[in-house]
């Protein structure tokens, strides 16, 4: 197993009291995005692998493009952006002056250009996405304009919730929060509440087959007809933290976008979001109970050996082990695969 001692704790999300066995693994909070991973993969990522090593996991061009597009809309619209303060090692809001469209695109294109593809297929996607990122940003801007995202826009706000059924807090970060001063385009049905929260999801074309000229064709990404369960779990947490906010979920591709809210999607109605939040808590309670089985153990390596016997790593999962062969092989050694 790949380990590296951490002498200085620079994670800003570590200020709550945690059980001793959780502290052994530097596990101090739950995150809605972590619920997407099966328990075995989650354990390898967040229990067995230290944060500084986890940051070495391979990414992919899809993720890098998604970050670029999200950053662009923040640069375009946000008046405050939450970032890590290098002095205090804590997340803090920074004032931000919105940028013009072309300036924002140029800035994120420069950031995306620094991404290093991890294999030949990733090179294909990287080169293609350099061309499609601007049009995807334009689609997202249209969606934000329709939603009225322009007043008091805050990006990457830190949301924290302590559920009495859990030992650890749930912590997440919202994409955009904003004041709904001019929302007549959405109709009278949202005369209240005056604040909105927007979760952004991007999808990207994927390479298909090689053409006669040696280049590759790409399959166009499409917006979904319904939101995914994982994304509903995320926005359910945001709704729990911000019950008075009008929640929207937007899917964006290079030539289209689709906005879901409680008026066109039953899953986003308040009572159904409450049900999804309960599903999220169930996942987190299960993981806490699993870890607390070893509350009296003092040997971390022994705990890990016991945990892997209780968890299915699901190495055939379609995305969660896309972390690089070095780390996949390390995990397979743990599970004796």
Each language-model region and where it sits:
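Metal-dependent nuclease catalytic cores in nucleic-acid-processing enzymes
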Residues: 181-186, 221-253
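Metal-dependent nuclease catalytic cores that hydrolyze phosphodiester bonds in DNA/RNA
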Residues: 1-174, 178-182
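A structural signal for short, well-ordered beta-strand segments and their strand-loop junctions
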Residues: 154, 178, 196-200, 246-251
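Short, solvent-exposed loop/turn segments at secondary-structure junctions
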Residues: 160-162, 203-205, 253-257
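Conserved catalytic cores of phosphodiester-cleaving nucleases, focusing on short active-site segments
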Residues: 69, 174-221, 237-238
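Glycine- and charge-rich intrinsically disordered segments
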Residues: 1-19, 146, 186-188, 299, ...
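Metal-dependent nuclease catalytic regions and adjoining charged, substrate-binding loops involved
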Residues: 227, 241-337
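Short, mixed charged/polar active-site loops
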Residues: 169-171, 190-195, 257-263
